[in-house]
């Protein structure tokens, strides 16, 4: 009689390469894998690992957030903000300070505003030449839980102290807004 072996721990479930077939992304991974191996700097390891991640884990960041975090860190104009994701424009921001940004993508409007105010935009291969160990850089990322789908996660909708959004087919007064919420439909709490 055979032994029932538990294969639960056999494989490590984590990405070792990007799932995307984008050749430029795989070249960046190759570059940062080399840099991490040669420099042993945590910055290169984090950049490499974030390049593997799925698109949902590359959340976008607004110009306002980038500028705020740079100001918060008290960084000078030589420092580079590093975002492994997209940098987007923020129309609520009147004046954009001088920023040096390195990102996978920068939207057209954000690019215009950064360059207009004397800032610079680097690609990750340019950053590797400029700062191979991550000196004078500020690594930042957008909020991963900002996606609409996260509003549906958590305690079941309807139970006490739950702020979770229900998945509803209809939004009329006779549906989620009815029983327990109006006296004409059973009761009202």
Swiss-Prot record:
Keywords tagged on the record: Cytoplasm, Ribonucleoprotein, Ribosomal protein
Compartments reported by the entry: Cytoplasm
Lineage of source species: Eukaryota, Metazoa, Ecdysozoa, Arthropoda, Hexapoda
Name of the protein this chain belongs to: Large ribosomal subunit protein eL18
Alphabetized InterPro entries for the sequence: Ribosomal_eL18, Ribosomal_eL18/eL18-A/B/_CS, Ribosomal_uL15/eL18, Ribosomal_uL15/eL18_sf
Family as reported in the entry's similarity comment: Belongs to the eukaryotic ribosomal protein eL18 family.
Ribonucleoprotein keyword on record: yes
Segment forming the signal sequence: none
Main location (coarse class): cytoplasm
Gene3D superfamilies assigned: 3.100.10.10
Any one GO CC term of the record: cytosolic large ribosomal subunit
Any single GO BP term: translation
Pfam families, per the entry: Ribosomal_L18
Single Gene Ontology MF annotation: structural constituent of ribosome
Gene designation per UniProt: RpL18
The UniProt record lists the keyword Acyltransferase: no
Domain of life: Eukaryota
